[in-house]
């Protein structure tokens, strides 16, 4: 089995020094734990669609529906799932797990670095949020086109409209998404897709918000995503389905 590099360090977004900082902090704060869990998971061959329910069990995550009615996910037809993005990795895993219980024809638009897991490649439509050069802009345009085609083929698509993890204005405030992008609304209009809005309760820890909001340091913020994921093992997560 090839060694998997659990890291948010991206050659397209970060220079060598930034990648070194991110990888060092990740290694110190949780990377080895996640790699160990993945290694134990990947020993046995499994169906790709089972990855989502399996990983929720391995991470010992409990998912609680706070809605006054059962979660309703159409089993067929174009569907866009939109949600706030308070955690980074865990909320994406939860959404994919929930959708996978009803259908296998779904994809998630998410950070391109998450393709480091081979099990995710089939499901990910990669986005480079730096959008800072011709190559990354081209990739993002291709991803947007693929997303539209996928919906036109009656697939399901998971999107975090903010395009970034929720942050708090100061260390005592609740975390909020950045302003939502117009792209999901355009997709809904163009593809006539059903929409499933989800709201997650919670936020990341003090260190993340210190780096993201107080210091406004993107490199240090990225370095905490693995740590935040490790911290969230064996915990309960609540969501509400909006009408």
Give short role names for the model-derived ranges.
Residues 92-94, 119-121, 162, 168-173, ...:
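A short secondary-structure junction signal
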Residues 156, 168-243:
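A cross-family acyltransferase "interaction/gating" segment
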Residues 128-139, 167-175:
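Surface-exposed cleft-lining segments at the edges of enzyme active sites
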Residues 35, 80-137:
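Catalytic core of membrane glycerolipid acyltransferases/transacylases, capturing the structured
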Residues 1-82, 92-94, 101-105:
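Membrane-anchoring hydrophobic helices of lipid-metabolizing enzymes
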Residues 98, 149, 186-187:
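Hydrophobic/aromatic ligand-binding patch that stacks against planar heteroaromatic rings
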Residues 153-164:
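A structural motif
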Residues 143-153:
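Short amphipathic alpha-helices and their capping/turn segments at secondary-structure boundaries
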């Amino acid at each position: 089995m090839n060694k998997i590099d659990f890291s948010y360090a991206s050659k397209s977004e970060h220079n060598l020094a930034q990648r070194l900082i991110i990888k060092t902090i990740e290694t110190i704060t949780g990377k080895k734990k996640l790699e160990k869990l993945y290694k134990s998971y990947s020993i046995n061959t499994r169906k790709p669609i089972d990855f989502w329910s399996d990983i929720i069990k391995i991470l010992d995550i409990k998912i609680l529906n706070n809605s006054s009615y059962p979660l309703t996910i159409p089993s067929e037809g174009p569907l866009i799932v939109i949600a706030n993005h308070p955690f980074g990795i865990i909320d994406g895993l939860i959404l994919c797990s929930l959708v996978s219980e009803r259908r296998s024809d779904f994809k998630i638009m998410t950070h391109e670095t998450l393709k480091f897991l081979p099990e995710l490649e089939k499901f990910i439509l990669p986005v480079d949020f730096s959008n800072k050069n011709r190559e990354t802009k081209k990739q993002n345009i291709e991803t947007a086109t693929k997303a539209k085609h996928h919906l036109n083929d009656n697939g399901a698509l998971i999107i975090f409209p903010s395009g970034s993890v929720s942050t708090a204005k100061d260390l005592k405030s609740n975390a909020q998404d950045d302003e939502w992008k117009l792209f999901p609304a355009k997709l809904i209009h163009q593809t006539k897709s059903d929409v499933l809005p989800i709201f997650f309760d919670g936020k990341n820890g003090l260190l993340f918000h210190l780096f993201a909001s107080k210091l406004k340091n993107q490199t240090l913020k990225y370095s905490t995503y693995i740590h935040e994921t490790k911290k969230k093992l064996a915990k309960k997560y609540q969501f509400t389905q909006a009408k």
